[in-house]
UniProtKB/Swiss-Prot annotation:
<comment type="similarity">
    <text>Belongs to the UPF0335 family.</text>
</comment>
<protein>
    <recommendedName>
        <fullName>UPF0335 protein Caul_0876</fullName>
    </recommendedName>
</protein>
<dbReference type="InterPro" id="IPR046367">
    <property type="entry name" value="GapR-like_DNA-bd"/>
</dbReference>
<dbReference type="Pfam" id="PF10073">
    <property type="entry name" value="GapR_DNA-bd"/>
</dbReference>
<dbReference type="GO" id="GO:0003677">
    <property type="term" value="F:DNA binding"/>
</dbReference>
<dbReference type="InterPro" id="IPR018753">
    <property type="entry name" value="GapR-like"/>
</dbReference>
Amino acid sequence: MADDAAPHADVLNSTAQGQLKSIIDRVERLEVEKTEIAEQIKEVYLEAKGNGFDVKILRKVVRLRKTDRAKRQEEDAILDLYLSAIGEI
């Protein structure tokens, strides 16, 4: 694979090659950070579970807090409408 890439190296000038390498390096560092953060979040949820909290509900609360209040109210109203239409509420 490296042999295939070598003939194309001259397609990009040295500045572009440097920029490309920098971008790739940054993305790779961010991917590592993302993995580390995901592990930390997992640990927080495990701590919450250990303290008796329902992790599924906590995740839902976090997700809901990310949503705009008006958008959430609109979704709730539509959900209630649908549930009412099928006799669930």
